[in-house]
Swiss-Prot record:
InterPro entries noted in UniProt: MPN (IPR037518), RadC_JAB (IPR025657), RuvA_2-like (IPR010994), UPF0758 (IPR001405), UPF0758_CS (IPR020891), UPF0758_N (IPR046778)
Family: Belongs to the UPF0758 family.
Protein name: UPF0758 protein lpl2409
Residues annotated as domain MPN: 102-225
Native source species: Legionella pneumophila (strain Lens)
Lineage of source species: Bacteria, Pseudomonadati, Pseudomonadota, Gammaproteobacteria, Legionellales
Amino acid sequence: MMVAHTAQQLDLREKLLTNGVHSLSDIELLAVFISSGNNKKSCLQLAYELTKHLGNLRNILNADLQSFKSIHGLGEVRYAQLQAAKEICHRSDFIDLQKEIRLSNTQQTYAFLKKRLRDYKNETFAALFLDNQHRIIAYEELFSGTINTATVYPRPIVERVLQLNAAALILAHNHPSGLSDASQQDLAITERIRDALDLVDARLLDHIVIGDNEVYSIFAENKWACN
């Protein structure tokens, strides 16, 4: 059985190397990542069961450890590797974003923030810190809360702006409900942070709300924020 499993693994790798990674199905791609099975199941069988259990690659990437381990033959090692691969992708996206001389590509910025925040189970509040040419200094996740709220304080944000010598920033947070519309609380904290930043001559460029499939720009939809 193990000989057959090994041959199957080699076939998948050969297919990838010969025809390119895009030639593999989702299950085959996951099987290459899993790499090896056990004496009862091949990597392809494990990939099939995991996909059947969780539905799709996005759900697999965002699954918690217990859901992942519910498939016999998959454990903490593979889960840790999967989370590391996911983070590598996020950091690669950030490198692409940093290549911009100036942060002028709004859609690229939205796409990065959406990919980074959309799948968190709890509301998470983040910021892109920029220099006076709107080049990215850092991306940081500053506050995390419950499924429907995160407590946000302007003071730590201002302190971080001063530490990084940032001249501007873009705020972003997710709505785990999937809805991207800004709440009254979102508008209020945006105004409080903008006013706090004014005291240190830093400019708030936007506050982006991330839903499941859409993003909402508080500044684009609420002209008061640009005054």
